Amino acid sequence: MGKHRLRSLALLPLLLRLLLLLLPTDASAPQKPIYMVMVPSLLHAGTPEKACFLFSHLNETVAVRVSLESVRGNQSLFTDLVVDKDLFHCTSFTVPQSSSDEVMFFTVQVKGATHEFRRRSTVLVKKKESLVFAQTDKPIYKPGQTVRFRVVSLDESFHPLNELIPLLYIQDPKNNRIAQWQNFNLEGGLKQLSFPLSSEPTQGSYKVVIRTESGRTVEHPFSVEEFVLPKFEVRVTVPETITILEEEMNVSVCGIYTYGKPVPGRVTVNICRKYSNPSNCFGEESVAFCEKLSQQLDGRGCFSQLVKTKSFQLKRQEYEMQLDVHAKIQEEGTGVEETGKGLTKITRTITKLSFVNVDSHFRQGIPFVGQVLLVDGRGTPIPYETIFIGADEANLYINTTTDKHGLARFSINTDDIMGTSLTVRAKYKDSNACYGFRWLTEENVEAWHTAYAVFSPSRSFLHLESLPDKLRCDQTLEVQAHYILNGEAMQELKELVFYYLMMAKGGIVRAGTHVLPLKQGQMRGHFSILISMETDLAPVARLVLYAILPNGEVVGDTAKYEIENCLANKVDLVFRPNSGLPATRALLSVMASPQSLCGLRAVDQSVLLMKPETELSASLIYDLLPVKDLTGFPQGADQREEDTNGCVKQNDTYINGILYSPVQNTNEEDMYGFLKDMGLKVFTNSNIRKPKVCERLRDNKGIPAAYHLVSQSHMDAFLESSESPTETRRSYFPETWIWDLVVVDSAGVAEVEVTVPDTITEWKAGAFCLSNDTGLGLSPVVQFQAFQPFFVELTMPYSVIRGEAFTLKATVLNYLPTCIRVAVQLEASPDFLAAPEEKEQRSHCICMNQRHTASWAVIPKSLGNVNFTVSAEALNSKELCGNEVPVVPEQGKKDTIIKSLLVEPEGLENEVTFNSLLCPMGAEVSELIALKLPSDVVEESARASVTVLGDILGSAMQNTQDLLKMPYGCGEQNMVLFAPNIYVLDYLNETQQLTQEIKTKAIAYLNTGYQRQLNYKHRDGSYSTFGDKPGRNHANTWLTAFVLKSFAQARKYIFIDEVHITQALLWLSQQQKDNGCFRSSGSLLNNAMKGGVEDEVTLSAYITIALLEMSLPVTHPVVRNALFCLDTAWKSARGGAGGSHVYTKALLAYAFALAGNQDTKKEILKSLDEEAVKEEDSVHWTRPQKPSVSVALWYQPQAPSAEVEMTAYVLLAYLTTEPAPTQEDLTAAMLIVKWLTKQQNSHGGFSSTQDTVVALHALSKYGSATFTRAKKAAQVTIHSSGTFSTKFQVNNNNQLLLQRVTLPTVPGDYTVKVTGEGCVYLQTSLKYSVLPREEEFPFTVVVQTLPGTCEDPKAHTSFQISLNISYTGSRSESNMAIADVKMVSGFIPLKPTVKMLERSVHVSRTEVSNNHVLIYLDKVSNQTVNLSFTVQQDIPIRDLKPAVVKVYDYYEKDEFAVAKYSAPCSTDYGNA
C-alpha cells in the first residue's frame, strides 16, 4: 500500500493535467467576446505611456473607460473610446504630474448593451525625474588650479531639458560647502561653470553636488592632490588566471612614454603569493612566497620572462588565490621611477561547463534546444572535445563534440515528457577524488539546468527562439516562433492572429500582428516576425507574442533581447591631422545632428594615468535611467490579482485500484506568469491562468498538509536602475587642452581651430552633443599625438648666487626611424659665460631611440632671471652615421627650448619704500627723492623704481594676493588674502569705478581665500591659527571674530555657507561672560594686543567691532552685553589713574562709533588727540613702550604693525559718523591718511597682516568719503640732476592704472613735480643687498651642518642643517616668528625631514617654497629651540657661496637676526 501511495504522489501532476483536459467543453458553443487590456505596472507621471487594447469576437458596440484612482481622487484617462468591431490598438496617455511616488488603482470598464466587463489592479506611479550628470574637465586637480565642469539634464528619451537647478555646490573632504550656485536655468540642456581652488585646499575627495528640481541629489567626484604628472606609464601584462596545474607563466613589463615611445632603463619586478593570515613570527613563508626579477629594458622598452610557478606553491591552501605583481622602472639618465602592477588569479578549476542560450521553460511537443560551453580554468573555450549530455525525464543519454568555439549543441524531444520539469546534465571529466589537508585538488565543473513545463489546457504552445549575442542598433531582427496547436481547439478556424508587444525602459514601445493561415493537419510549424532594432528599444527589449484560441485560451511566449547602448545622435570627432608638432595648428571637426550643442574636452593622457576615470559613455548614460528593464511588479503594485475562473474541485480518482488526488503544481508557468515577468498588468476575461485547485480540509490521515499549499510566484524581481613648424619653441604645458562649447551647423558639422600645446604627449579628446531632435550623442575617444621627431631637454638648478658655477646639460632624444646628425648650440648672452665641458664637436650622430647629452660649464654674470636658449638642429649632411646616411625630417627639424635661471646677489636683500600723497589743487607741488645706499651694499645689487597712481588704493588693488613679502601659512595670515578684496570691491562700487575684470579677479580671490580659511576651522565652529590639529586644538577667540565678520561681509560677493557664520557666532556667544566681556581663548600671535590688565577689554572691543561690522543690531543680546562691558571699562579707565592703553582707546573709539554712541566716541578721540604724535603734515599714534629704532639706519623705517593698526582704527572712528563725516572730521582724517600712506610697502600692504587689513579698510573708507572726479588731469614729471626725465598723466580714466618707471642711477637724487587737479599717490621702491655682518640682534641664531667637513663621502650629496634659535630682545618673548632658511645652490630639502619638524611643540607649520624652507614658530623665548632637517644635492654646483638664514618677528619686522652657513663641500664640485 505504501509503495502504491508513493507512486500515486509521483503521478499527481500528470493526473491534474488529464483531469483538466477532460473538463466538459462545447466546441459548437458561440464564441463570447474577449476583452484584453495591457498596461505597464510602473507608470511615470508627466511622461507619455501606452496601454494596448484587444477586442475580439465583438457582437455589439462597447464603450471603454479607463481611470486612475487614488486617495487624492479619480483621474479619467480614456472616456471616449467606442468600439464596434474587433480591434487591436495601442493608445498613448499621460499620467498627471505628482509630487511623490504613489500606488494607484488602474480601472478598466467595458460596457455594451448586454455585456459588462470591469477589472481593476494596482500600479505604481513614479514622479517625473530628469537624468542629470556632471562632467569635470579632468579627474584630479592640483592646489590653485581651476575646476571646470558642466551640468547636463536630459529626459528619459535623452533629449535636453532646460530645467531649473535649485542648488549646486562644491563639497570638500570635510563636508564644507566651498562654492554654491542657486536657481539657474540650463541652456540647451547644459551649463558650464568653474571655480578656483585655493593654493592650500584640503586635499582629498571633493564632490560636485546637484539638487534637481524634483529634489533628487546627484554627485560627481573629483580629487585634489599635490602631484607630479607621470612621465611614462608602466604596463604590466600577466595572465588573468592560471590553474594550480600550470608550471610557468609569462610576465611582461613595458615602459611607454606618454607620447608613445619606449622608455630606456631598468625594471624590477616582485611577484608574491601572500599568506591569508600573515605573521612576522615564523619566517618569510608565513608572510608570502615571492620571486624578484630585475633586468635592463630592451629596445622596445619591455621586459618579458617565463616564470616558474613552483616557488609559489600553487597547490597549497592557506595562501591567497592570486599572485600580486609589482613592477618599478627607473629611467636611464634621470633616475625617475614609475610603478605599475598586475594581478593573476589562481584557480583549481581545470575545466568548466555551462549552459548557453537555453530556455527556462519547455513546451511539450516542441523540441528543447540549447548549447553547452566548455572552457578551461582561464575561461578559454576548449574545441573538439567529447562531452556527455543526459536528461532522465526524456530518456536522453548522448555524447557530443564541441566545435571550434567550445560549444556543443543539443536538442531534446519533449513529446513523451509527462512531468513538469526537465533537468539536463552536462559532464566532461570526473574531478579528482583525492583530498589532502592544506592541499588544493583540481576540479572539473559539471553543468546542470532545470526547465519547467508551460501550462496549456489544450496542449497548444508557442515558443520564441532566444539569441545568444547582444544585438546591434540599426539592424533588423528576425524572430523565429515555433508553434504547436490543438486541432480540436482550433475548431473551423481558417487563420489565427498573433499579436505582439515590445517593451523597453519599462514602457510599451511597439505593437503589431502576424496572421497565420491554418490548414487541417498542419498544426505544427514555425514562422518569423521582423523587428527593427533602434534606440527606443535599448538597452533591453522584451517581446511578448500571443494568440487567443477560439475557446478563450491565450497561448504565447516572451523573449528578452539585450541591445547595445546606442544613442540616436551620432557624434564623431576627428583631428586633422591627428598628430603634430607643438605650437602648430590643427583642426578639430565635430559631426553630429544639425544644430547640436556640443561640449568638447581634450586632456593630457598623463592626467588619466595619474587618476583613471570612468569615461562618459553610453552605458553610463543608460545607467541614469530610473528603469532600464522592468521585471515583475514593483512594490505596492504586487497585490494578488483577482481570478474569476473559479477552481477545480478535488475529486478523488481511482486508477487500477490506486487513489489519486489533484493538487496545485507550482512549477508550471502560465500566460499570466509570462506577462507578469514582463511587468505587464492584464485586464481580461480570457483564459490566461492555469486553474486553481479548490482547497479541501483533510484530517491527519490524508496527504500531508504541505501538499495543499499554494506557492505565490516571485513578485519583486523589480527594477534594474541606477541612482547611484620647422622650428619649435616650447613653454605652454596645460593639463586640459580643449574645454569648449560649439554648435554644429545645419549640415551637422562644426570645425574648431586649435593650437597644439607644447607638451609632448598623447591627448585624449571626446565630445557629447545635445539635439532637440535626436537627443544626446557621444563621440568615441580620439587621440592626438603631440610629438616631435627629436627634441631637447635642459637640466639646470632653480637658482644660483652670482659667482657660482654650474653645469648646464642639454639632452637630445631621437625617435625618428632613422639616424640624424644634430648640432646642439647654446645661444651666447652677455648675462653669462659658458664653455663646453667636452671637446666641442660640430655635430653628433643620434640614431633611433637614442639620446645625446651636451654640457657647458656656466658662470652667470647678471642678476635676476637669466634666460638660457638651447637649440638642436638636424643637419643636412653626407657624413655617415655608422652605415646610415642621416636624414633631415620634413617637420620639426629644429627644436629650441628656453629656460630661465634665477641669479641672486650675495648676501641679504633689503627693500626700502618711500611714499607720498601729492595733491596740487591747481598749484604745482614738488618733492625730492633722495636715494642713498649703505656702505656695505653688494655691488650692482641696487635698483629702484617709481610708481604713479591716481588712487591711494591703486597699489593694493594690483597686489591683493601679494600685499606682504611674507609667508601666508596660518589662519590669520590667510585673512590678509581675503578681507582686503571686500574693501576694494566696496570702495570701487561706491565710487562707480568697478570693472568686470577687477570684479572677476577679486571674487576669485575671495573664493580661494574662503576655501583656505576652512582649513583652520574646528568642529565647534571656531577657528585657530593652525587649524584643528592634535595637540594644537585651542580655538582662538580673536581669530574667530575676525573670520566671522569677514565671512559676513563677503556674503554679498560670494557664496558663504550660513552654517559657518551661525556656528562661529554661537561659539563666540558662549565665550561671553556675565559682565558682557569676552574670555580669551588661544594664543595671540601679536602680543601688542596684550595690554596687561586691559587684555579682556581690548579683546572685547575687537569682538564688538566684528559683531557690529557684520551688521548685527545694537539690540542683539550679545552686542548689547558687549557694549555694556566696553562702557563700564571706559568709565573705569576715565576715572582712574594712568588712563587706558592707546591701542585699547583706538578700538573703543571705533566700537562706540559703530554703535552710534557719538558722545563717547568724541570723548575718546579727544583723549587720543592729546597723545597723538603730530608732525608737519601728518598725525599718528605710538605705543608707550615702542621698541627703539637702530640709529644706524639712514632712512625712516616702516612703522611697526601695532602703530599702523591703532592709527587706522582712529581713522575709522573719525570716518564712522551718521549720516556722513563732517569737514572737520575729514580734515583730521587727511593728516592720518598722509601718515598711513607713507607706511605702505611696495605692494600696497603694510608691515604685517592685521595692520594691513585694518589700514586698507580705513583707506578705502576715506577714499569713498572724499572721492571726486577731477575736471583736469594731473601731470607728473620725474627728473634727475642729469639727463633723465619722464612724464606721466593721471586722469579719471587711468587713475587705477599702475604706471611705473625704473630709475637709471642709484644712488641719486630725483625731483617729482605734480600739476593739475586731484591727488597723485607716488611710491618709490629701492632694493639692494648687503652682506650679513656681526651685530647685536634681538634673536640669536646659530647654524651648523652635519657633517661639518667634506671628509665624509656622503657630504657631497647630502647633509643636515641644524638651527639653534633664541630670543634676546626687550620683551620676555617674541610674537610668532619665521625661520627662513635659504638653500645652498644646487641643493633641495628632503621634504619628509622638514615635515617632521612639525612634531616639535615649538613648530606650528613648515613650508618648502622654491629654494627656501619656512618654519613657523609660535613664539621664541630665551630658551633655545633646536631644529634640524636634511638637504640633498639636486644639481652639482662649483664654488658654492654661503646661504643665509633669517629669523624675524612676524609683527615687529625690525626685530630679526641673520646668520649664514656653507655646505660641507663648498669649494668642491661634488659628484660632477
UniProtKB/Swiss-Prot annotation:
InterPro entries in the record: A-macroglobulin_rcpt-bd, A-macroglobulin_rcpt-bd_sf, A2M/Complement_sys, A2M_N_BRD, A2M_TED, Alpha-macroglob_thiol-ester_cl, Alpha-macroglobulin_TED, Ig-like_fold
DNA-binding: is it a keyword of this entry? Answer: no
Enumerate the glycosylated residues: 59, 74, 250, 399, 651, 772, 867, 989, 1364, 1422, 1426
SUPFAM superfamilies from the entry? Alpha-macroglobulin receptor domain, E set domains, Terpenoid cyclases/Protein prenyltransferases
Q: What induces it?
A: By inflammatory stimulus in liver. The level of this protein increases during acute phase, then decreases again.
List this protein's GO terms for biological process.
Answer: acute inflammatory response to antigenic stimulus; acute-phase response; embryonic liver development; luteinization; negative regulation of complement activation, lectin pathway; response to carbon dioxide; response to glucocorticoid; response to nutrient
Domain of life of the source: Eukaryota
First-listed, main subcellular location of the protein, grouped into a coarse class: secreted
Q: Which UniProt keywords apply?
A: Acute phase, Bait region, Disulfide bond, Glycoprotein, Protease inhibitor, Secreted, Serine protease inhibitor, Signal, Thioester bond
Q: Please state the span of the N-terminal signal peptide per the UniProt entry.
A: 1-27
Which cysteines pair up through disulfides? They are: 52-90, 254-302, 272-290, 473-566, 598-769, 647-694, 819-847, 845-881, 919-1319, 1077-1125, 1350-1465
- Which compartment or compartments is the protein found in? Secreted
Q: Where is this region: Bait region?
A: 620-750
Supply the Pfam families for this chain: A2M (PF00207), A2M_BRD (PF07703), A2M_recep (PF07677), MG2 (PF01835), MG3 (PF17791), MG4 (PF17789), TED_complement (PF07678)
Q: Name one GO molecular function term.
A: nerve growth factor binding
Specify the cross-link site (Isoglutamyl cysteine thioester (Cys-Gln)).
970-973
Coiled-coil stretches are none
Where in the body, by tissue, does this protein show up? Highest constitutive expression in ovary. Low level in testis, uterus and non-acute phase liver. Protein found in plasma.
Q: What function does this protein fulfil?
A: Is able to inhibit all four classes of proteinases by a unique 'trapping' mechanism. This protein has a peptide stretch, called the 'bait region' which contains specific cleavage sites for different proteinases. When a proteinase cleaves the bait region, a conformational change is induced in the protein which traps the proteinase. The entrapped enzyme remains active against low molecular weight substrates (activity against high molecular weight substrates is greatly reduced).
Q: Which family does it belong to?
A: Belongs to the protease inhibitor I39 (alpha-2-macroglobulin) family.
Summarize the subunit comment: Homotetramer; disulfide-linked.
Name of the protein in question: Alpha-2-macroglobulin
Q: Which organism is it from?
A: Rattus norvegicus (Rat)
| Name of the encoding gene | A2m
